């Protein structure tokens, strides 16, 4: 019965763990934070003053954006591997397909971010070389592009998020179905085991009652034997004492007779003395 309980508990726990993998209030994944940082970095290029723009090096901008792209892809890869690891026990086929889909979407996101890096480097160079009147035109184009970039990055992020949600929902459904199937399959065995345990407890209870009755009877027999032994001991003691009293009486009898004789002599002497007294006239 213990093994059935453990197996059934594991099945229920599996369903609970699967549901916990997809929660609406889950914190934002690290890779999404990196995408937001990338876009903010690009959009801030259009807000820099002319003097600050002149101090920014194109190579420096390219390296920093490359770093953000690399970090984003690394976080997204780690996120994908973590999801695949968690999904494999419940749906290995879906986990493998999710990994492939995320690779395609990650490639699309990387392409858009790389394009944004190249465009930003190009715009920076134009801002440095254009005259003041043309600089405004470049800034307008930068502003337009950053708005479009925001939409593209949001779309890429949303596609990844929706893809993950779809697979998580499927996995949750499978896990729930498996848990219900296991429950239905093992419920008769659980009931049978429970009935067996109840019968065993009943048998044990009857055995304990029988043993208790046997012990009670043994105690009654022992108590009766002890009573008889005590009565026998008391009778022996009484007989012994009676014998001692008779013996003591026999020993004291001569002395009693002698005392009576002496008392009688004393009484006779008193009578004689009384008779000898003169009679008053």
Curated annotation (Swiss-Prot):
Recorded GO CC terms: chylomicron; extracellular matrix; extracellular space; extracellular vesicle; high-density lipoprotein particle; intermediate-density lipoprotein particle; low-density lipoprotein particle; very-low-density lipoprotein particle
Primary localization class, coarse: secreted
UniProt xrefs under Gene3D superfamilies: 1.20.5.20, Apolipoprotein
Cited InterPro entries: ApoA_E, Apolipoprotein_A1/A4/E
Residues in Sequence repeats: 67-88, 89-110, 111-132, 133-154, 155-176, 177-199, 200-227, 228-249, 254-281
Any one GO MF annotation of this record: phospholipid binding
Subcellular location per the Swiss-Prot or TrEMBL entry: Secreted; Secreted, Extracellular space; Secreted, Extracellular space, Extracellular matrix
Signal peptide: 1-18
BP-aspect Gene Ontology terms: acylglycerol homeostasis; cholesterol efflux; cholesterol metabolic process; chylomicron remnant clearance; high-density lipoprotein particle assembly; intermediate-density lipoprotein particle clearance; lipoprotein biosynthetic process; phospholipid efflux
Region span, 9 X 22 AA approximate tandem repeats: 67-281
Keywords per UniProt: Extracellular matrix, Lipid transport, Lipid-binding, Repeat, Secreted, Signal, Transport
Similarity field: Belongs to the apolipoprotein A1/A4/E family.
Name used for this protein in its record: Apolipoprotein Eb
Gene source species: Danio rerio
């Amino acid at each position: 019965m213990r093994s059935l309980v453990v197996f059934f508990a594991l099945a229920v726990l599996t369903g609970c763990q699967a549901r916990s993998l997809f929660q609406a209030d889950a914190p934002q994944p690290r890779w999404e934070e990196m995408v937001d940082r990338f876009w903010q970095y690009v959009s801030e290029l259009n807000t820099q003053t002319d003097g600050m723009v002149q101090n920014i090096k194109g190579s420096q901008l390219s390296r920093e954006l490359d770093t953000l792209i690399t970090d984003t892809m690394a976080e997204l890869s780690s996120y994908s591997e973590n999801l695949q690891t968690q999904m494999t026990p419940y749906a290995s086929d879906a986990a493998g397909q999710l990994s492939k889909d995320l690779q395609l979407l990650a490639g699309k996101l990387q392409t858009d971010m790389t394009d944004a890096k190249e465009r930003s480097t190009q715009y920076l160079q134009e801002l440095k070389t254009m005259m003041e009147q043309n600089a405004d035109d470049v800034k307008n184009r930068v502003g337009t592009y950053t708005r479009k970039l925001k939409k593209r990055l949001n779309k890429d992020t949303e596609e990844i998020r929706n893809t993950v949600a779809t697979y998580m929902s499927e996995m949750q459904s499978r896990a729930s179905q498996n848990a219900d199937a296991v429950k239905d399959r093992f419920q008769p065995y659980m009931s049978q085991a429970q009935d067996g345990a109840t019968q065993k407890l009943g048998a044990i209870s009857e055995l304990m009652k029988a043993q208790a009755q046997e012990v009670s009877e043994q105690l009654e027999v022992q108590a009766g034997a002890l009573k008889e032994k005590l009565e026998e001991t008391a009778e022996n003691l009484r007989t012994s004492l009676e014998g001692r009293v008779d013996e003591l009486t026999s020993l004291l009898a001569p002395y009693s007779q002698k005392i009576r004789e002496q008392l009688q002599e004393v009484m006779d002497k008193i009578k004689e003395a009384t008779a000898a007294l003169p009679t008053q006239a």
